[in-house]
Amino acid sequence: MRRMPLIAAAVVLAGLSTLATHAQFIGQRVHDDFKDTSILRPPAGSEVAIVVFEDLGCPLCARAHPIEVQAAQQYYVPLLRYDFPLAQHIWTFNGAVCARYLQDKVSPKLADQFRSDVFSSQRLIDNKDDLQQFTRRWMQQHGQQMPFVMDPSGSLAARVKADYDLGLRLNVTATPTLVVVTRNNYQVVCGKNNLVDPTQLVPILRAAIAQTTAAPAKPAAKPRAKQ
C-alpha cells in the first residue's frame, strides 16, 4: 500500500526534473507560456538558429536588432525573422509590407538594410505618412523607384499576417520575442517572464552550439524574413 505513493512521487519528481532542464542551455528554466512550439526549430541543414518575432516600431527590437545580426554572422547560424506588428504602432504593418516588397522585388540584402535603417530611424517615424516619406527617400537613396501601389494583390500583407498568426499560435505577447533554438530544445532570450536583455543572446547561443553534436561548419543563409 505504501509503494504506490512512492512511485507516484518518483513520477512527479521525474516530471519536475524534465521541466527544470527543458528549454534551457544555460541558467535556470524560465516559464514561457508558449503553446505551439513546433515552429521553434532551425531550418534544414542547421543545428542551431535564432528566431525573433519583431515589430519595426518597438524600441527594444531596435536595440536587439544589431545584436541579432552580429551574432548570426559571427556564429554562422540562421536568423529567422517573423513580423509581429503591434496594433498600437499604427505604421509598422505597412513597414513590414515594404520590407517584403524589397525582399521579393529587389533583393533580400536590400530588404535587410531597410529593416536595419527603419530600426535606427524610429524617432523619425510616428505614423503612416512619416513611413511613406521615409520609404520614398530611402528608395531614392538606394537607386530604387517607389511603386505607386506597393502591394496591389495583397499577397505581401497576407504574408505579414501569416507571420503574426504564427506568433499567436506560439503565444507571443511581447516584442521582441527572441529565442535560440536547436532541433529538440530552445531558450528564450527576450519576450517572456520579464526577460528584456538582448545581450544575453550571445552566451545562450554559444551554449546551444556547444550542446549540439555538430555545430554549423559554414556560413548559413543571410538573415531573412520568414517566407
Language-model regions, residue ranges each:
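Bacterial N-terminal signal peptides that target proteins for export
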Residues: M1-A8
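Bacterial N-terminal signal peptides
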Residues: A8-S17
